[in-house]
Amino acid sequence: MMIHDLDMARFVLGEEPVEVFAVGSNLIDEAIREAGDVDTAAVILTTASGRICQITNSRRTTYGYDKRLEVHGSKGMLRVSNVLENLVESAKITGFQSALSQPFFLERFEAAYLAEMKHFVEAVSTGSTPIPNAQDGLRAQLIADAATLSWQEGRAVAIPK
């Protein structure tokens, strides 16, 4: 359930993670447990230089599709917030209220999917290598497999090179 987050983490970290520790539980849907998976999970990725990435996922939110990113560094912080259905926000004595997050990933990433397809077609047309490429997909899968093993065995796992 977090393969895309693991892939993105590689680019945000700027270097390959070398170790993963994962935890998970079933808090929402018994059918997911019966399928051998979790509905709530967290991983910590560590790089050789000591960079740390924490990813948390849940299969269900009550307020729309939740996808956020924060990067903290020695000179500041970068935050990518949820995309809301609209930008209207009201303020009253009881507090602030805004629109819901977009309800589904297709709405949230429509422009990104179109840009991705355009880039892929351009790469194929010009004979260049698309980004991400097959090696990027393989690396994300190796991290996911190591995270699954970590969750199953309850220990940190080295990510294969």
Regions found by a protein language model. Name each.
Residues 51-52, 75-77:
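Structural motif
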Residues 54-57, 80-82:
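Beta-strand scaffold of nucleotide-dependent catalytic cores
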Residues 56-60, 70-74, 160-161:
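Glycine-rich Rossmann NAD(P)(H)-binding loop
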Residues 69, 85-97:
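Short polybasic amphipathic segments
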